[in-house]
């Protein structure tokens, strides 16, 4: 009798994707983050769904509804903090996943990489809109400052901002539409994830060596299912520790003050996972220039495949490129730190230097180093 798993139309898709999928035998723990992102997405959708049952998207009651969830709803506090800190875990996994792709040359799979970039932008948009919903001081002023950046677009900027706001300032209309989009986008993200996996399974996974591993494949189950489950346990343990012991560690205390359009917080800043881009934005004195640098800091990932000049795919056997890669990581960490500091000396200068080095590294130094490595290896 034939196994139903291999004949049933629906089960066959699941089977070829998660059971019988031929997978390189040399995948390291850096390949765990894709499945961890899937777990994060499920956690966010489930906790978000239950939070939406009690949340009201009205400026008069939004802040109080979040307080009500934490105080009066059964296990509402754990849902709220799982959702807030789950977003942080999401971005940690996301940045590690992208970093893995850059290090091991996974961007050679252009369709998978481009869908991944769409996913990155969609997740960033979702997280930004979610941060506005509790309607605290940082929610309100963060929304005002970030949406106002669109006014830098020549000719249509001001009209565009007012169209997004639904009025002349961030108000009830803005909050309602942000809630609607924050609820909708995760389902669009889920669809994009399926397309991402579809393209990945067309080519098969990359591996740490960057060398085709067709002669040495193993089935996904049981080898990588067990490995992924270990990853889930580690991530969920870290998330649980964060939620149960220091739930406000990554948040901003100003968000416990109800939104007040009449008083500005001393230092407006986004959540920690956007600080690197915020630092790049602030390091350019011109408004339009800053907005362009902000967008390009993430959009630069789209041209990374074109800047690949090495004859090798992965950085595993390229020590000079490895040094530059870890310097790039250091610049990103420096930018994250600077984004959380006030705009004063010496932070301004450090931010400007780190911003220039970030772009210089990706656009000039890494491609040149790859060419030099080719020459050293007489390729």
From Swiss-Prot:
<dbReference type="GO" id="GO:0008121">
    <property type="term" value="F:ubiquinol-cytochrome-c reductase activity"/>
</dbReference>
<dbReference type="GO" id="GO:0045275">
    <property type="term" value="C:respiratory chain complex III"/>
</dbReference>
<feature type="binding site">
    <location>
        <position position="201"/>
    </location>
    <ligand>
        <name>a ubiquinone</name>
    </ligand>
</feature>
<keyword id="KW-0249">Electron transport</keyword>
<feature type="binding site" description="axial binding residue">
    <location>
        <position position="83"/>
    </location>
    <ligand>
        <name>heme b b562</name>
    </ligand>
</feature>
<keyword id="KW-0813">Transport</keyword>
<dbReference type="GO" id="GO:0046872">
    <property type="term" value="F:metal ion binding"/>
</dbReference>
<dbReference type="InterPro" id="IPR027387">
    <property type="entry name" value="Cytb/b6-like_sf"/>
</dbReference>
<keyword id="KW-0472">Membrane</keyword>
<dbReference type="InterPro" id="IPR048259">
    <property type="entry name" value="Cytochrome_b_N_euk/bac"/>
</dbReference>
<keyword id="KW-0812">Transmembrane</keyword>
<keyword id="KW-0999">Mitochondrion inner membrane</keyword>
<feature type="transmembrane region" description="Helical">
    <location>
        <begin position="320"/>
        <end position="340"/>
    </location>
</feature>
<dbReference type="GO" id="GO:0006122">
    <property type="term" value="P:mitochondrial electron transport, ubiquinol to cytochrome c"/>
</dbReference>
<feature type="binding site" description="axial binding residue">
    <location>
        <position position="182"/>
    </location>
    <ligand>
        <name>heme b b562</name>
    </ligand>
</feature>
<dbReference type="GO" id="GO:0005743">
    <property type="term" value="C:mitochondrial inner membrane"/>
</dbReference>
<feature type="transmembrane region" description="Helical">
    <location>
        <begin position="113"/>
        <end position="133"/>
    </location>
</feature>
<keyword id="KW-0830">Ubiquinone</keyword>
<keyword id="KW-1133">Transmembrane helix</keyword>
<dbReference type="InterPro" id="IPR048260">
    <property type="entry name" value="Cytochrome_b_C_euk/bac"/>
</dbReference>
<keyword id="KW-0496">Mitochondrion</keyword>
<dbReference type="InterPro" id="IPR030689">
    <property type="entry name" value="Cytochrome_b"/>
</dbReference>
<feature type="binding site" description="axial binding residue">
    <location>
        <position position="196"/>
    </location>
    <ligand>
        <name>heme b b566</name>
    </ligand>
</feature>
<comment type="function">
    <text>Component of the ubiquinol-cytochrome c reductase complex (complex III or cytochrome b-c1 complex) that is part of the mitochondrial respiratory chain. The b-c1 complex mediates electron transfer from ubiquinol to cytochrome c. Contributes to the generation of a proton gradient across the mitochondrial membrane that is then used for ATP synthesis.</text>
</comment>
<dbReference type="Pfam" id="PF00033">
    <property type="entry name" value="Cytochrome_B"/>
</dbReference>
<comment type="subunit">
    <text>The cytochrome bc1 complex contains 11 subunits: 3 respiratory subunits (MT-CYB, CYC1 and UQCRFS1), 2 core proteins (UQCRC1 and UQCRC2) and 6 low-molecular weight proteins (UQCRH/QCR6, UQCRB/QCR7, UQCRQ/QCR8, UQCR10/QCR9, UQCR11/QCR10 and a cleavage product of UQCRFS1). This cytochrome bc1 complex then forms a dimer.</text>
</comment>
<keyword id="KW-0408">Iron</keyword>
<feature type="transmembrane region" description="Helical">
    <location>
        <begin position="347"/>
        <end position="367"/>
    </location>
</feature>
<feature type="transmembrane region" description="Helical">
    <location>
        <begin position="226"/>
        <end position="246"/>
    </location>
</feature>
<dbReference type="Pfam" id="PF00032">
    <property type="entry name" value="Cytochrom_B_C"/>
</dbReference>
<feature type="binding site" description="axial binding residue">
    <location>
        <position position="97"/>
    </location>
    <ligand>
        <name>heme b b566</name>
    </ligand>
</feature>
<protein>
    <recommendedName>
        <fullName>Cytochrome b</fullName>
    </recommendedName>
</protein>
<dbReference type="InterPro" id="IPR005797">
    <property type="entry name" value="Cyt_b/b6_N"/>
</dbReference>
<dbReference type="InterPro" id="IPR005798">
    <property type="entry name" value="Cyt_b/b6_C"/>
</dbReference>
<dbReference type="InterPro" id="IPR036150">
    <property type="entry name" value="Cyt_b/b6_C_sf"/>
</dbReference>
<keyword id="KW-0679">Respiratory chain</keyword>
<dbReference type="InterPro" id="IPR016174">
    <property type="entry name" value="Di-haem_cyt_TM"/>
</dbReference>
<feature type="transmembrane region" description="Helical">
    <location>
        <begin position="288"/>
        <end position="308"/>
    </location>
</feature>
<keyword id="KW-0479">Metal-binding</keyword>
<feature type="transmembrane region" description="Helical">
    <location>
        <begin position="77"/>
        <end position="98"/>
    </location>
</feature>
<keyword id="KW-0349">Heme</keyword>
<comment type="similarity">
    <text>Belongs to the cytochrome b family.</text>
</comment>
